[in-house]
């Protein structure tokens, strides 16, 4: 009898690639490898031009970005959420899963975490016959929101993506949220908003929906005291679901 090695799919952030995300998440990756978990890092399909950036970058730094092959994204950035088009990024991940899956779980960072949340919710529809993920790790993740006209000062999921971020009541996936208290790119309040969607869908079950805040910024934590309990939750969810 052959033992199947658990497999996790990793989706990098804006202006990264799989290789860079592998390096940035080396602490978690190495602990998972020790636990005999396979980590697959893939590249986003959208190749950005300098004009696509939501901030200024000098020519020298942009050339270095091109040389390092990190001018990548899962979708083009927009401050107006209903203008976002995730179809190309979504298709590339779905095609990879169909060719290389099934996967036991998914890990996303920032833009990759927004996409991985949607894939977690919709995996059975996107890839027919693929089981629900056992675990989904959302690092500096966020949803696509807009001002709620019925509740001034509050946000709601943008109508275009309401179905994408809808959590099914029978979801069995363990959700693990990681975010930085000092994150300026994706403020922790945005990650907590997404966390609350899942927590509410699971009737407040904090054994199925976990949150870990670290003191850093827009990054994957690598300090052992922070990541050890996270990796333990990942590996235990893989084992529980296999038993």
UniProtKB/Swiss-Prot annotation:
This is Family of serine hydrolases 1. It comes from the Eukaryota. One of its GO terms (cellular component) is nucleus. Its EC number is 3.1.-.-. It comes from Saccharomyces cerevisiae (strain ATCC 204508 / S288c). The keyword Hydrolase applies. Keywords: Cytoplasm, Hydrolase, Nucleus, Serine esterase. Present with 14600 molecules/cell in log phase SD medium. GO terms for biological process: apoptotic process. The active site is at residues 110, 183, 218. Serine hydrolase of unknown specificity. It is found in: Cytoplasm; Nucleus.
């Amino acid at each position: 009898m052959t033992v199947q090695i658990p497999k996790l799919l990793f989706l990098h952030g804006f202006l990264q690639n799989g290789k860079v995300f592998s390096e940035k998440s080396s602490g978690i990756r190495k602990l998972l490898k020790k636990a005999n978990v396979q980590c697959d890092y893939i590249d986003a399909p959208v190749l950005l031009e300098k004009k696509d950036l939501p901030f200024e970058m000098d020519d020298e730094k942009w050339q270095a970005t091109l040389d390092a092959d990190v001018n990548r994204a899962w979708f083009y950035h927009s401050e107006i959420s209903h203008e976002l088009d995730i179809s190309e990024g979504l298709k590339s991940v779905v095609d990879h899963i169909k060719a290389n899956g099934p996967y036991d779980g998914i890990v996303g960072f920032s833009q990759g975490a927004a996409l991985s949340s949607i894939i977690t919710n919709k995996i059975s529809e996107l890839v027919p016959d693929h089981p629900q993920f056992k675990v989904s790790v959302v690092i500096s993740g966020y949803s696509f929101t807009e001002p709620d006209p019925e509740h001034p000062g509050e946000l709601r999921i943008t109508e275009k993506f309401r179905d994408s971020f809808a959590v099914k009541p029978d979801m069995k996936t363990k959700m693990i949220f990681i975010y930085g208290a000092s994150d300026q790119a994706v403020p922790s309040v945005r990650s907590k908003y997404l966390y609350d969607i899942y927590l509410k869908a699971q009737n407040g079950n904090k054994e199925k929906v976990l949150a870990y805040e670290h003191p850093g910024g827009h990054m994957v934590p690598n300090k052992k005291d922070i990541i050890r309990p996270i990796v333990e939750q990942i590996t235990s969810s893989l084992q529980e679901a296999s038993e």
